[in-house]
C-alpha cells in the first residue's frame, strides 16, 4: 500500500490545523526526499510527515491510515498521487494565471469603489443640503470600515464553504448594495449602504492571498502577489479620475450605476472562469462523491479536521486577531503596511479641496490629480517585478545555498522606505508655497512608488512566512490597514488647518522615516524573531 503520512506535532499548532502547511514544492502534495520522510519549511517551524512503507495508494484516491495504538484502519481520501491534476498546485500555468487574473480583477473593482466617489462629495453635500466637512470625509471612509470588518467574517466562511462560494455571493451582494447607494434619498441611507457594500466587497481582499497560496509555488508567488496587490493600490488612484468627470457630466448617482455595471460584468466573468482552489473543500467534495459511489460512509478527507462547523468558524475568526496580538512579525509589518496604505486615503480625501482652492481646478480636472500617485504605483510595480525576484534568488544563492528565506523579500524596501517620506515632503511644501502644480504631483508620484513597493513586499513576506495561514495573516493585515485608511483621513482637514500643508505632510513624512528602519531590522533579525519560541502561536 502507498505511503500514508502522519502529521508531526508543530510547536505553533495545537489542535489539528484546517489544512497542512505548505511544502517546499507543493502546498498539499507529497514530496518524498528519498529517505522515507517528507519535510517542508514554514515561517515559524518545520513540518515533518513520516511515511509508512506498508501502505498502498488506492486507485480512487483513498488509502488506509493506521494510527499508532489503533488496531483498525480508517479510510482516508487524499489526492491521487503528487501529480493529481485535481490539486490546484498541479494546474497548468494558463489555468492558474487565468484564475489569478480574475481574482485580481475583482480585487481591483472593490477599491475602485472606495475612492471613485471622492470628487463628487461636494456635489453630494449640496444635494443633501449640508456643509459638514467631517461628514463629507466619513461618506468616503465608511466604505473602508466595511472593508475592515469583512475579512473577519468572509475568511472563515471560505474555510467552511470554499473560496468560490464566497466570491460569488460577495459579487452579487456588492452589486445590490451599490445599486442601493445610487438610490439613496438621504445621507444616512448612503452611509449605511456604503458600509454594507464594503463589508461584502471585502471578499477578494480577505481571501485573495489564500487563493494565490493555493495555486502557486515559491517561484510564481512574487509575480502573483504583485498582480493581486495592484488592485487595492491602483484602484483608489484611478477611481477619482473617472468619478470626477462622471459626476460633472451626469451627477454623483451615475458613479454608483457605473460601479454596478462593472461589478456585474466582473461577476459574470467570475461565474464562468473561477474554480475552487481551497484544498480541504476539494477533498471534502471528493470524499462525498466517493461515499455515494462506493457506499462506504467511513471515508473521510485527509484534510478533515473533524471539528464542528461552529468551532471551525470561531477559530478562523480568532486566528487573525491572535496573529495581531501575539505575533510581532504580523503586528509590526501590518502596522507599517496600514500606515502606508492609509496615506493614500489621507491624501485623496483632501485633494478635491486643496487643488480647487490653491490651483483653481474644476470638478473634472481635479480627478486627474489622483492619477499621479497611480502612475507612481505602476512604476513601483515595474521596479518590484524587475528587481524583487532577482534579488531574492541572488541572496538565496549567495547566503543560503539556493534556499529561499522570507527575509529576502525586503531589499526593494530599502529604497522604497526612503522614497515615501521624500515624496510627502515634496508634496506638502510645494502646495504650501503654491509652487507650479506639476511639482506637488511629482511628490505624490514618488510617494506612490514607495507605497506600492512597500505594500507588495510586506504582503509577499507574510504569505511566505505564514504559508499555512496566509489567508489569516493577510486578513489580519487587511483589517488593520482598512481601519487606518478609514479613521486617519477623518482628521486630515483638521490637521492641515492647524499645522498647514507643509508641516502637516512633514509630520506624516517623519512618521514614515521612523518606520523605515523596520525594513533593515527585519532583514537582519526577522528570522530569529519569527522562530523565537516565545512568539509561536497556538491555534
Swiss-Prot record:
InterPro entries in the record: MFS, MFS_dom, MFS_trans_sf
Transmembrane segments: 100-120, 135-155, 173-193, 195-215, 227-247, 254-274, 328-348, 363-383, 410-430, 438-458, 473-493, 506-526
Cellular compartment(s): Cell membrane
Residues covered by region (Disordered): 1-85
Bilayer disposition of the protein: Multi-pass membrane protein
CDD domains, sorted: MFS_Tpo1_MDR_like
Start-end of Basic and acidic residues biased regions: 50-69
Gene3D superfamilies from the UniProt entry: MFS general substrate transporter like domains
Sequence ranges of Low complexity compositional bias: 36-46
Gene Ontology MF: a single term: transmembrane transporter activity
Sorted UniProt keywords: Cell membrane, Glycoprotein, Membrane, Transmembrane, Transmembrane helix, Transport
Chief location category: membrane
Glycan-carrying positions: 60, 90, 99, 132
SUPFAM superfamilies on file: MFS general substrate transporter (SSF103473)
Gene Ontology cellular component annotations, sorted alphabetically: plasma membrane
Family: Belongs to the major facilitator superfamily.
Protein role: Efflux pump that might be required for efficient secretion of radicicol or other secondary metabolies produced by the radicicol gene cluster.
UniProt protein name: Efflux pump rdc3
Species in which this protein is naturally found: Metacordyceps chlamydosporia
Amino acid at each position: 500500500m502507498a505511503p500514508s503520512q502522519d502529521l508531526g506535532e508543530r510547536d505553533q499548532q495545537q489542535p489539528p490545523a484546517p489544512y497542512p502547511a505548505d511544502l517546499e514544492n507543493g502546498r498539499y502534495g507529497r514530496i518524498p526526499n528519498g529517505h522515507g520522510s517528507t519535510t517542508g519549511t514554514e515561517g515559524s517551524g518545520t513540518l515533518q510527515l513520516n511515511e509508512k512503507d506498508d501502505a498502498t495508494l488506492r486507485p480512487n484516491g483513498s488509502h488506509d491510515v493506521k494510527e499508532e495504538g489503533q488496531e483498525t484502519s480508517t479510510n482516508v481520501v487524499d489526492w491521487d498521487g503528487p501529480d493529481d491534476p485535481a490539486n490546484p498546485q498541479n494546474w497548468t500555468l494558463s489555468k492558474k494565471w487565468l484564475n489569478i487574473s480574475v481574482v485580481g480583477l475583482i480585487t481591483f473593482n472593490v477599491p475602485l469603489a472606495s475612492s471613485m466617489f471622492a470628487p463628487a462629495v461636494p456635489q453630494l453635500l449640496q444635494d443633501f443640503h449640508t456643509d459638514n466637512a467631517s461628514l463629507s470625509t466619513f461618506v468616503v471612509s465608511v466604505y473602508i470600515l466595511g472593508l475592515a470588518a469583512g475579512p473577519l467574517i468572509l475568511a472563515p466562511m471560505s474555510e467552511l464553504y470554499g473560496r468560490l462560494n464566497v466570491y460569488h455571493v460577495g459579487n452579487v451582494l456588492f452589486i445590490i448594495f451599490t445599486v442601493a447607494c445610487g438610490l439613496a434619498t438621504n445621507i444616512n441611507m448612503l452611509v449605511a449602504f456604503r458600509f454594507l457594500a464594503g463589508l461584502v466587497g471585502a471578499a477578494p481582499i480577505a481571501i485573495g492571498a489564500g487563493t494565490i497560496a493555493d495555486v502557486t509555488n515559491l517561484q510564481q508567488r512574487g509575480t502573483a502577489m504583485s498582480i493581486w496587490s495592484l488592485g487595492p493600490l491602483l484602484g483608489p488612484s484611478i477611481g477619482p479620475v473617472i468619478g470626477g468627470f462622471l459626476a460633472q457630466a451626469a451627477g454623483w448617482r451615475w458613479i454608483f450605476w457605473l460601479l454596478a455595471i462593472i461589478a456585474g460584468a466582473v461577476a459574470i466573468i467570475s461565474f464562468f472562469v473561477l474554480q475552487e482552489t481551497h484544498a480541504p473543500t476539494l477533498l471534502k467534495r471528493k470524499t462525498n462523491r466517493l461515499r455515494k459511489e462506493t457506499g462506504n460512509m467511513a471515508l473521510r478527507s485527509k484534510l478533515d479536521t473533524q471539528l464542528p462547523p461552529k468551532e471551525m468558524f470561531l477559530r478562523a475568526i480568532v486566528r487573525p486577531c491572535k496573529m495581531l496580538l501575539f505575533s510581532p512579525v504580523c503586528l509590526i509589518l501590518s502596522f507599517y503596511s496600514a500606515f502606508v496604505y492609509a496615506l493614500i486615503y489621507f491624501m485623496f480625501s483632501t485633494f478635491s479641496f486643496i487643488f480647487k482652492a490653491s490651483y483653481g481646478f474644476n470638478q473634472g480636472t481635479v480627478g486627474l490629480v489622483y492619477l499621479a500617485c497611480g502612475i507612481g504605483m505602476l512604476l513601483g510595480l515595474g521596479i518590484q517585478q524587475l528587481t524583487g525576484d532577482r534579488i531574492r534568488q541572488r541572496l538565496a544563492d549567495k547566503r543560503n545555498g539556493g534556499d529561499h528565506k522570507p527575509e529576502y523579500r525586503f531589499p526593494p524596501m530599502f529604497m522604497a522606505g526612503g522614497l515615501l517620506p521624500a515624496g510627502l515632503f515634496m508634496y506638502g511644501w510645494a502646495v504650501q508655497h503654491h509652487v507650479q502644480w506639476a511639482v506637488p504631483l511629482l511628490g505624490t508620484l514618488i510617494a506612490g512608488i514607495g507605497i506600492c513597493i512597500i505594500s507588495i513586499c510586506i504582503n509577499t513576506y507574510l504569505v511566505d512566512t505564514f504559508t499555512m495561514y496566509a489567508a489569516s495573516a493577510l486578513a489580519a493585515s487587511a483589517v488593520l490597514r482598512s481601519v487606518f485608511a478609514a479613521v486617519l483621513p477623518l482628521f486630515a482637514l483638521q490637521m492641515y488647518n492647524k499645522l498647514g500643508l507643509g508641516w502637516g505632510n512633514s509630520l506624516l513624512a517623519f512618521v514614515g522615516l521612523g518606520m523605515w528602519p523596520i525594513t533593515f531590522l527585519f532583514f537582519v533579525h526577522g528570522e530569529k524573531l519569527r522562530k523565537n519560541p516565545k512568539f509561536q502561536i497556538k491555534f
